[in-house]
Amino acid sequence: MKEVVIYTDGACSKNPGPGGWCAILIYKGIKKVLKGFEENTTNNRMELKAIIEGLKALKEPCKVTVYTDSAYIVNAINQNWIGKWQKNNWKTSEKEEVKNIDLWQELLEFLKVHNVKFEKVKGHSTDTLNNMCDEIARSMIKEMR
């Protein structure tokens, strides 16, 4: 099984507002940058979108390590919030509807195909690829305005 690393980040101006996302895929040292923009969105949607688009770009099942600065996503997966949400008919522990259900469900489909591990990185710190993702995601907002 091929091993791929994906760095991701999402950004949003005004939250909600215009947003951008970036995913950097790395396979055997070769980098591929994916990026996108949405007119009216939230930061969490852009974080999820970056991961989904990164996984969507893979042409076959892979072993993937996703690096993200989103504690929301890492905790939802690694602490199995997502499993609890599904059991509770997509309700949080406070009985509120989970936000971004459409994207969580799409992500779950890719998690069935790929063996994915999520790692939290500190945002706006010393991680070069995370910083690059952040810059690209933010630049998408500026470019598309």
Curated annotation (Swiss-Prot):
Family annotation (SUPFAM superfamilies): Ribonuclease H-like (SSF53098)
Binding residues annotated for Mg(2+) 1, in chain numbering: D9, E47, D69
GO biological process: DNA replication, removal of RNA primer
Residue stretches making up the RNase H type-1 domain: 1-142
GO MF term set: magnesium ion binding; nucleic acid binding; RNA-DNA hybrid ribonuclease activity
InterPro entries named among the record's database cross-references: RNase_H, RNaseH-like_sf, RNaseH_domain, RNaseH_sf, RNaseHI
EC number: 3.1.26.4
Subcellular location: Cytoplasm
Obligatory cofactor(s): Mg(2+)
GO CC list: cytoplasm
Cofactor: binding comment: Binds 1 Mg(2+) ion per subunit. May bind a second metal ion at a regulatory site, or after substrate binding.
Catalysed transformations (reactions): Endonucleolytic cleavage to 5'-phosphomonoester
Disulfide bonds: none
One Pfam family linked to the record: RNase_H
Enzyme class, broadest EC rank: hydrolase
Keyword annotations of the record: Cytoplasm, Endonuclease, Hydrolase, Magnesium, Metal-binding, Nuclease
Quaternary structure and partners: Monomer.
PANTHER family tied to this protein: RIBONUCLEASE H1
Annotated family: Belongs to the RNase H family.
Task of the protein: Endonuclease that specifically degrades the RNA of RNA-DNA hybrids.
Protein name from the UniProt record: Ribonuclease H
Lineage: Bacteria, Bacillati, Bacillota, Bacillota incertae sedis, Caldicellulosiruptorales
